[in-house]
Amino acid sequence: MKKMTTALFLGLTAMVFTWTSCDKSEDLSQKKEKEEQHVISKHADILLQAEQMTNYDKWVYIDLESGKQETKTDYREWVYGMMNRQTGEMQQITKTIPERANNEPKKWHIAFHLYDPMTNGGEVMIAGKDTTSLDQITELPKGGTWTPDKPVWILVDMAGMMQMPPTMGYSKGFSNPNLHKYMRRAGMGQYEMANKGRIFIVIFKDGSFAAIKFTDITDATGKKKQVSFDYKFVRKK
């Protein structure tokens, strides 16, 4: 009987030790995972056009980790002619300007043109309608459709708009269709906020990601075009 009692005691002790070890291992694993994530929350105001009919050839790049912004002239090949909006093809091409040296900043995550946003090799999805706060995003969603940037014609030169036929310059650029949904066209050269309150999630090549909530597309006066948003950036160490 004594031997059985001793054996039972040792068995229970081993089980408790195992459970405790598992709990500690899980705690350490969760702690390690949290330590591997570096979370930054910021607000960004990106001025895109201070005066009408300007800055069509500019991109504003932002490093979401530091918040640093840099404005650069579009360096890709420009094609002059008429764009068929139904087919997305250029017609009546009059001239081209070859691609110039890449002038993108060494570090950037997303960039904004007056009418188009793009990512640095990232993919974008829009969180469900029940997700309305950045605080709700603590990890990447398990499902959903991620959309990469797509080739598009970017309007960069409006100088020939009044010619007959109109001949404007377009860059062979890229834009992200999902990220573009923060605004919608409201008329010739006019846009308005769309998907208000929705959270846009961008995942980058290194595994880091950002949750973005757009707040405005003009400045406080309503005269200058800018994109404003709150965001949470999660960097993998």
Regions of interest found by a model, annotated:
Residues 1-9:
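Bacterial N-terminal signal peptides that target proteins for export
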Residues 9-16:
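Bacterial N-terminal signal peptides
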Residues 17-21:
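C-terminal motif of bacterial Sec signal peptides marking the signal peptidase cleavage site
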Residues 25-237:
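Surface-exposed, beta-sheet-biased, low-hydrophobicity segments with strongly acidic/polar composition
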